[in-house]
Every structure is written in structure tokens, then in C-alpha cells.
Amino acid sequence: MKSIGLLSDTHSHIDGDILNFFKDVDEIWHAGDIGNMNVVHQLKAIKPVRAVFGNIDGTEVRSHFKEVESFTCENMNVVMVHIGGYPGKYAPGIKSLLQKSGANLFVCGHSHILKVMYDKILGIMHINPGAAGMSGFHYKRTAIRFVVDNQDIIIYS
């Protein structure tokens, strides 16, 4: 069993509220639009970090992270990208990527809208944590914590 802190779209902003929100998780995943490496350094100071770069990320961030991250967490196959869409309206190439990968969990960001939904057609859980940063059209900063237990996902606040 592993607890995960998930955020996206920090756009160079990280603060004590976010760091405190993640203090009890095992790993932090960042779904892109990090902004700068200072965000990553602050997250890594408290927990191990997995991340992908997003469309606003420059050369420095892109030199440390990939566009697509595929990995296994507690027997769950995970695919993480920044621009991914959502079930029924995936970004170009994403549905094919998910089908080929055998993913059980798809994580993305970009929309600045927190959304957790199950894709009944592909049999994949989709999680977008919304935006944890200050830049954008969102009114509320969001992030999410969940537990991966074998092939189960338990979301908690």
C-alpha cells in the first residue's frame, strides 16, 4: 500500500499549504506545468517525486523529466502526461497510448479542473488534480491524495 500526493499546474508556485498537505504521503506525483526546478526541489525535500513536463515548462524542467511517464505502483500500471483530456474526450494519441500501455490509472493535468472519473470503455481510472498554482482561470487551488493498494485506489482528503 502506498499513499500518493498528486498535483499539477503549479506554474512556479509552491507554498507551505501544499507542502503540508503532502507531509504524510509516501510519494508526490506532479502532472506537469511545474514552472521551475525550485518547485521540484521543495517537493523533493519532503518526499520522493515523479513528474512529467507540461506545455509551459522550459528547457531546464524538460531536461529532468519526460513528456510521458509509464510506471508501476503497487501492481497498478500508471501512465502520466500533462495534456491528456478525459474519458470520451482524450487528447490526440492518448487513447491509443492507454490501450497499448495496459494502464489501470491515467493521470494528467492541464485543464486546471479537478476531475476523477472511470473510463468504462477502457477500464481505466482517470485522475486530474486540477491546479495547485496561482496562475490560470481557476478560483480554487486543488491537489489530491490517494492510496494505491494493489489494484485499488482509495481517495482521501
Language model regions located:
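Short beta-strand scaffold segments in enzyme catalytic cores
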Residues: 69-70, 115-118, 142-146
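Binuclear metal-dependent phosphoesterase catalytic core
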Residues: 2, 73-74, 101-102, 127-157
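Short Pro/Gly-enriched beta-strand edge/turn motifs at strand-loop
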Residues: 49-57, 98-100, 125-131
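Active-site environment of divalent metal-dependent phosphoester hydrolases
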Residues: 12-16, 35-39, 56-62, 85-90, ...
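Acidic/histidine-enriched, beta-strand-rich ligand/metal-binding domains
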Residues: 52, 82, 105-106, 112, ...
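N-terminal active-site segment of His-dependent metallophosphoesterases
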Residues: 1-49, 57-75, 80, 139-142
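Internal catalytic-core helix/loop-beta-alpha segment
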Residues: 77-111
